Amino acid sequence: PKAKRVIHLCMAGGPSHLETLDHKPELARLNGKPMPESFTKGQQLAQLQGSRNKLKCLGPQHEFKPYGECGRLMSSAFPHIGSIADDIAVINSMSTEQINHDPAHTFMNTGSVIPGRPSMGSWLLYGLGADTDELPGFVVMTSSGGGQDQPIAARQWHSGFLPSRFQGVKFNSKGDPVHYVNNPAGVSRDNQGDLLNTINGLNNLLGQRQNDPEIATRIAQYEMAFKMQASVPDLVDVSKEPKHVFDLYGAKPGDGSFASNCLVARRLAERGVRFIQLYHRGWDHHGNVKGAINTVAGHIDKATAALVKDLKERGLLEDTLIIWGGEFGRTPMAQGSGRDHHIQAFSVWMAGAGIKGGASWGATDELGYAVAKDHVSVHDLHATMLKQLGINHERLTYRFQGLDFRLTGVEKARIVEEVLA
């Protein structure tokens, strides 16, 4: 396996591929003109877009420039991500099945639109186990800013029908990362340890009688909570980080920003956390896409590039897989001054852990409406991720209610070998 861990940078709300990674000069030429019917005929359109005969093209709202030795054309709104163009592989031919945020996130995270399935991080913990016993193996953090802050349901990091010890743990971005990390006044760590040993002894007796795996999970969770009272304060104490690191990320300790979360993500990676998921809410740009992209770029551009550069400098990028992207794309048609949800095409990029830096794969049509070449499904993305972790996606299964479930579903998923070194 090339990867030991995954950092998933989820740009929640549906980033526009047309203002980030997918260069469309023909769309710019048709700006303000009617959307050619040849693209939309027979297509189911989002309800928010209005009648079909009023659809107008909206040209890219930001200039694209070549970045890196690979010369990849990328939005000039994200110059810092442009500076790592030679480290990332871009896939411009993604599509999804769900046009609303929550089910689209559910599909991206679990490979199914049916709530209650295990999330990516839970599957990884089930398949590989944790690489640390001092912190949870699956950690989630959220930030917001730049647009409408769509809520992120906790089931996006749930373990579903897998044992609950595999579910993600959400860290707070401000204040104590987890509740009750400090003991109440008058309760020493020794007192807490004695209480924990007594409770676990009783749970062990109950487990021997009932043979319930959730009792074993409860014991493990109590033990993890006790360890986290020591490990979490050390994790979030960034006071020993040098000033140049804060400058690199653009982070201010404790401000709850995406930049601060990226710095914590690096520290989680150093400590062996298997799956780290950062959500940044603010990409739902139904209006003012030009200004909103500028705003959200101010939140995520510098920190995203800093995370890649920092991991690379520390020798961690070679075994850390980074995935950047959202739940769907945006329409090439205007919705006022913005763009509507779009499932036929969107872009993601990957870096680290055996990814071919500077590579590009797939293409959309000349307006960015639909995939035209080398389609990549969400399940293909999952299969590729698992491959880099040394997992055969067809063999990572769990029997539930008489069926063998897997992250990549029952249809054939393809590993995107073209973005692998």
Q: Language model features by range: what are they?
A:
Residues 1-421:
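Ligand-binding pockets and gating/stacking loops
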